[in-house]
Amino acid sequence: MKLVQFWHDSAPALGLQTPQGIVDVQAEAARRGVSAPADMAQAIALGDEGLSQLAPLAEGARCFTQAPPAPVVTQTGRILCIGLNYRRHAKECGLPLPPAPVPFCKFSNALAAHGEAVKLMPDYKEYDYEAELVAVMGRPARDVSVDEALDYVYGYTCGDDLSTRDLQFARGGQWLLSKTFDGFAPIGPCLV
């Protein structure tokens, strides 16, 4: 199942991507007189129960939308990232491969929808992007064993990690400011 979000009355609404188009989950659920999550946060919170409410809505759906896409996930507690997570990229950046993962964060203002234009600032000239696999957590996790880790993942989507390298390296290699501008974390188009 491919879950998406789209803008409805300036708020994100949940959709199902099907070969026929994007099903408006709330409109389709209302047409059928059934309950369904209103947005991605509700779907994630409901876990398997939410997925079982959503699956039948794709069959014989009549309520489709052409609304613009929203970021697949909009209500995030944290956006945790791992820097220099593969050898070739570390080499491209001229940096040594770290002995342990290098964590950094992005803020929710950095989220953007798949295909959304990202506004670049004229003060910076060295923009960079990295394609990423985004794991969306389905429930809180702390001190989880390696064997259990994937039990906490709700789904996956694609993402881009945008950076202004001139800002990043001008300030001693910090990562936060250069990676958290509005729209610097486009994700989507769907969550699987």
Description of each model-found segment:
Residues M1-P101:
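N-terminal non-catalytic cap/leader segment that marks the start of a structured domain
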Residues T76-V192:
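Glycine-enriched loop-and-adjacent helix/strand subsegments that border the catalytic/binding cleft
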